[in-house]
Amino acid sequence: MLVLLQAVCITVLTLLLIGRLQLLERLLLNHSFNLKTVDDFNILYRSLAETRLLKVVLRLIFLVLLGFCCYRLLVILM
């Protein structure tokens, strides 16, 4: 039961991190209007790529944990 509770907590924290990354991505896109040099654009492009990669990784972790929670719940109910 404790393992299930930990998985649920980690799943919720993962969803919160995904939301924070989406907010960060929006803020970075809003600053794209203030770019003055090519270096600024390259830094912004790399930052956006990193946030998108982090979102993909966190979504994969979320799906794995969600599957684990469902599996554990089915085992407990049987």
Swiss-Prot record:
Signal sequence interval, chain numbering: 1-23
Spans through the membrane: 56-76
Highest taxon above the source species: Viruses
Keyword set includes Transferase: no
Subcellular location: Host membrane
InterPro entries: Corona_7
Cited Pfam families: Corona_7 (PF02398)
Topological relation to the membrane, as annotated: Single-pass membrane protein
GO cellular component: host cell membrane; membrane
Keywords (A to Z) from UniProt: Host membrane, Membrane, Signal, Transmembrane, Transmembrane helix
Predominant location category: host cell
Function in brief: May function in the formation of membrane-bound replication complexes or in the assembly of the virus.
Family from the record: Belongs to the coronaviruses ns7/ns7a protein family.
Protein name per the record: Non-structural protein 7
